Amino acid sequence: MPLINLPAFAGDLLADFERLKTLRVDTPVIQPAEPFLDMAGEDLRRRIFMTQSETGDSLCLRPEFTIPVCLRHIETATGTPQRYAYLGEVFRQRREGSSEFYQAGIEDLGDTDTAGADARAIGDAMRVLSNRLANRRLKVTLGDQSVFEAVIAACGLPGGWQKRLIHAFGDPKQLQKLLGELADPKSPGVFGHEVERLAILGILDDEERLVAHLAETMEATGYSTNASRSPRDIARRLKEKMELATTRLDRAALAVMREFLAFDLPLSEAPAALHAFAKKSRLKIDDALSLFDARVAAIAKVGAESDLIRYRAAFGRPLDYYTGLVFEIEAEGAPAVLAGGGRFDRLLTLLGAREHIPAVGFSLWLDRIERAIAAAGGA
């Protein structure tokens, strides 16, 4: 489909992508909706334009390129490593601006040098933006979900709580809300008198007794287990909810998590600060910090200006498929994010790839870049 109303710099941008040794690909505008609904995150899900096929399949207008490019890679059985570039329209419901706009970017699939590929993604994004905005100083914000995951695991949180906190990564208000719940958990009574009675009797602490009690209750009330979940499913779900609601994190562990989330410093200073924090807090997060250190060193090797990059421990991006590095780039004086990206090592497996394929990439918002160029007096 021919692209119309492209920004004037689009041709130069594609030339940059070619020089970066990428393969340009396109994907259909109409996409299966399920992958986006399952993996893209709540912020994007509520902006998707949904439709339906004649056979009742849920479809949507392409809201981003990462998932479609990964699906294309799987369908064509292309080998890795492979670097894809794209430029095309995406469609999202937005409060301001057009609901259809251009994005471009690079998806780097299959490179097993995680630190090197991460650094290349950041360096490439900075380079193509600098080529459009030569007179504007860039600002890069970098986070790392894998370090965050290592910290909360080392604090000894139950698996259910770890999942909730990971899901909230990048949402400061939600993270603070969850930390507040960990500081002041609920009592069993908030689930109702019957659950409180079971807790007092000790039945909640014994899964077999709880399953038997639920089975007897369901049989006595004529509730069909065939029409819903089994007593064991209900028991496990209830215990999970109770664990989430009643888990208390001690003050020392809460202080450790809050100290970690407060980190906001130049990237060059971050490795030493994180190692000192881990040592002081007695956290065993060596593997996550080793990768972090390697990435910082690799960023310096690709020539990215490290003084433009800040590390924020609480920084994440509103897409559920990220697993490690996350970053966004702005231009000083332009409040909008011009580029964003990160690592998504689990995505291709979730989409159906037969083998594990590590991946990292970034997207550019061309309408925002165009406005930034105009504001700077460019052409």
Swiss-Prot record:
One of its GO terms (cellular component) is cytoplasm. One of its GO terms (molecular function) is histidine-tRNA ligase activity. GO terms for biological process: histidyl-tRNA aminoacylation; L-histidine biosynthetic process. Transmembrane segments: none annotated. Keywords: Amino-acid biosynthesis, Cytoplasm, Histidine biosynthesis. The keyword Amino-acid biosynthesis applies. Pathway: Amino-acid biosynthesis; L-histidine biosynthesis; L-histidine from 5-phospho-alpha-D-ribose 1-diphosphate: step 1/9. InterPro entries: aa-tRNA-synth_II/BPL/LPL, HisRS-like_core, HisRS/HisZ, HisZ. It is found in: Cytoplasm. SUPFAM superfamilies: Class II aaRS and biotin synthetases. It comes from the Bacteria. Required for the first step of histidine biosynthesis. May allow the feedback regulation of ATP phosphoribosyltransferase activity by histidine. HAMAP family: HisZ. Belongs to the class-II aminoacyl-tRNA synthetase family. HisZ subfamily. This function is generally fulfilled by the C-terminal part of HisG, which is missing in some bacteria such as this one. Heteromultimer composed of HisG and HisZ subunits. This is ATP phosphoribosyltransferase regulatory subunit. It comes from Sinorhizobium fredii (strain NBRC 101917 / NGR234).
